[in-house]
């Protein structure tokens, strides 16, 4: 697909004279365009749901969720991956973000990195990619060689693959087994796909990782019950989570958390089932860490 024919490279009539308007009007134009992004994502919800189910199946079988992208797309994958351990208590490495050009590229542009097909393949080889893993290729244009080659290599290994792009019929969408293509139209600044396309990608990644964690028992109701308390704010959040899940007092919640080494799931089961920490943990282990199953089946 030629660059000039891509929707993400088109000219946006709504912003054609954005350099001549007031600062407030400038903001209104950008905001009006941003409002269209969730609607574009809404149109591909069935595709997102299908991807979540596949990701969950693979991760449940011992696989990993691997994000692969260049530039803004790569950074968004790294952002999503890096938030999973503290938010959901998963081990670092379960969700992995890879970016063309390596760690240096997180903060700096690395010339030519996105054009390296070898880079996409080698980065996946370096993390020991296996057929159990799911590779999610992220590229607003859908034409990034680094991502396309990575998806091709992943499919050769037998991996399940997902392609996120914002141009219908792109190489990324046709190379991946599952295509997620929110079409957000032309950008406010022509070709600046870090804007609407980047926002759409972030919304999709939010759903993929959050959906995986919900289906993995990391959420009870709407509470992040595997949150790791790495700072004072999260210590307080843990107390509130146990309170909200059980209806107990803050003092009871804190006491339960202290007794079980600050594991929210265990504390919740302790309070709701009137158990000590060891027995609560045992029952959770018997039900794969799902609070709901402990409560419903016992």
Swiss-Prot record:
GO BP, sorted A to Z: 1,6-anhydro-N-acetyl-beta-muramic acid catabolic process; amino sugar catabolic process; N-acetylmuramic acid catabolic process; peptidoglycan turnover
Residues annotated as domain SIS: 55-218
Active site: 83 (proton donor), 114
Catalytic activity of the protein: N-acetyl-D-muramate 6-phosphate + H2O = N-acetyl-D-glucosamine 6-phosphate + (R)-lactate
PROSITE patterns reported for this sequence: GCKR (PS01272), SIS (PS51464)
Pathway entry: Amino-sugar metabolism; 1,6-anhydro-N-acetylmuramate degradation; Amino-sugar metabolism; N-acetylmuramate degradation; Cell wall biogenesis; peptidoglycan recycling
EC number: 4.2.1.126
UniProt entry keywords in alphabetical sequence: Carbohydrate metabolism, Lyase
Keyword Transport (UniProt): no
Entry's induction text: Induced by MurNAc 6-phosphate that releases the repressor MurR from the DNA. Repressed by MurR in the absence of MurNAc 6-phosphate.
Family per similarity comment: Belongs to the GCKR-like family. MurNAc-6-P etherase subfamily.
Other known facts: A lyase-type mechanism (elimination/hydration) is suggested for the cleavage of the lactyl ether bond of MurNAc 6-phosphate, with the formation of an alpha,beta-unsaturated aldehyde intermediate with (E)-stereochemistry, followed by the syn addition of water to give product.
PANTHER family, per database record: GLUCOKINASE REGULATORY PROTEIN
Record's subunit section: Homodimer.
Known function: Specifically catalyzes the cleavage of the D-lactyl ether substituent of MurNAc 6-phosphate, producing GlcNAc 6-phosphate and D-lactate. Together with AnmK, is also required for the utilization of anhydro-N-acetylmuramic acid (anhMurNAc) either imported from the medium or derived from its own cell wall murein, and thus plays a role in cell wall recycling.
Name by which UniProt lists this protein: N-acetylmuramic acid 6-phosphate etherase
Gene of this entry: murQ
